[in-house]
C-alpha cells in the first residue's frame, strides 16, 4: 500500500500524481487518515523533481495538525531548507505551506520567521525574488496575526 502511495506521488504522469496529491491534501484537512504515512512522505522532500518536492511540502503541512507524536520535530530543519530551494517555485510553495505548519504547530513560528529573516534570496532572478519576498511577507502576517490571537 505505502509503496503504491509513493509510486503514485512520483509517477511520470504529473497530472495524475498531482491529482493524487490534491486528494491527500484535501482529505488531510478533515481526517488523519494519511498521517500514518507521514514517514513515507518525508523522503519526497529531497526528490530530484521539484514537482514531487512541492507535493511533499503541502502533504506534510496538511498533516501537521494531526502530528500528536511530534514527528515534525525531526523534519522541520529539512523542511525549512526549502525556503531557498534551488527552484524558486518550490521555495514559494514551501513558504506558503509554512503558514499551515505554523498554524498547526505554533512552537515553530519563531523558527519559521527567523528562517525568513536570514534567507539568502540572492540566487534567484530579479523577476522571482520580489514574488518570494511577497510570499514571505504574507506568511509572516498570517503567523504573526495567529500569535496575537492566541
Where are these regions (language model features)?
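Alpha-solenoid HEAT/Armadillo repeat architecture
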Residues: 10, 46, 65, 84, ...
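N-terminal alpha-helical scaffold/docking segments in eukaryotic complex subunits
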Residues: 1-32, 136-150
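Amphipathic alpha-helical scaffolding segments comprising HEAT/armadillo-like alpha-solenoid repeats
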Residues: 1-9, 32-43, 69-82, 106-120, ...
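Structural signature of alpha-helical solenoid repeat scaffolds
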Residues: 25-26, 61-64, 99-100, 117, ...
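Helix-adjacent hinge/juxtasegments
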Residues: 48-88
Amino acid at each position: 500500500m505505502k509503496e503504491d502511495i509513493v509510486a503514485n506521488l512520483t509517477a511520470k504522469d504529473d497530472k495524475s500524481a498531482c491529482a493524487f496529491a490534491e486528494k491527500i491534501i484535501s482529505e488531510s484537512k478533515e481526517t488523519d487518515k494519511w498521517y500514518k504515512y507521514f514517514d513515507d512522505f518525508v523522503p519526497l522532500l529531497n526528490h530530484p523533481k521539484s514537482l514531487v518536492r512541492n507535493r511533499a511540502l503541502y502533504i506534510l503541512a496538511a498533516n501537521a495538525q494531526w502530528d500528536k507524536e511530534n514527528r515534525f520535530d525531526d523534519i522541520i530543519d529539512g523542511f525549512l531548507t526549502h525556503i531557498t530551494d534551488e527552484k524558486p517555485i518550490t521555495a514559494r510553495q514551501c513558504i506558503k505551506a509554512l503558514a499551515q505548519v505554523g498554524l498547526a504547530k505554533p512552537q515553530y513560528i519563531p523558527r519559521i520567521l527567523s528562517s525568513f529573516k536570514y534567507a539568502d534570496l540572492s540566487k534567484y532572478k530579479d523577476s522571482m525574488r520580489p514574488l518570494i519576498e511577497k510570499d514571505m511577507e504574507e506568511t509572516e502576517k498570517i503567523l504573526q496575526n495567529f500569535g496575537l490571537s492566541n
